[in-house]
């Protein structure tokens, strides 16, 4: 079952400037991952808040890279495939974050994920 938005992955030109700006808005740093990922995860205070994973663009795409939904069952991927969703990755472990993700794009090219 898909239960909520888990995280929003954003790519930025200047990581520390983005972190500083979001800190002023009220988000708090909850984790930094080492290079080469070099991401900073931030959330608003309180329980069950969406995580913003801010990552350097390294000269590439800037903006929202994908939005991830929290899933409770690995079978969620199969259920969506039966409905016509084509996944680019399935049940891939991201070592730096400990998340297992399955990624797909919609007809407009926007990136989406399921994560545990």
Where are these regions (language model features)?
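Core segments of cupin and vicinal oxygen chelate
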Residues: 2, 9-49
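Vicinal oxygen chelate
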Residues: 4-13, 31-32, 41, 57-116
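Short amphipathic alpha-helices in soluble, non-transmembrane regions
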Residues: 21-25, 79-84
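Short beta-strand micro-motifs enriched in acidic
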Residues: 30, 55-57
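Short loop/turn positions at the edges of beta-strands in beta-sheet-rich folds
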Residues: 36, 46, 71, 106-108
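Extracellular/periplasmic catalytic domains that process cell-envelope and extracellular macromolecules
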Residues: 46, 60, 95
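Short, charged/polar, Gly/Pro-enriched secondary-structure boundary elements
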Residues: 47-52, 108-112
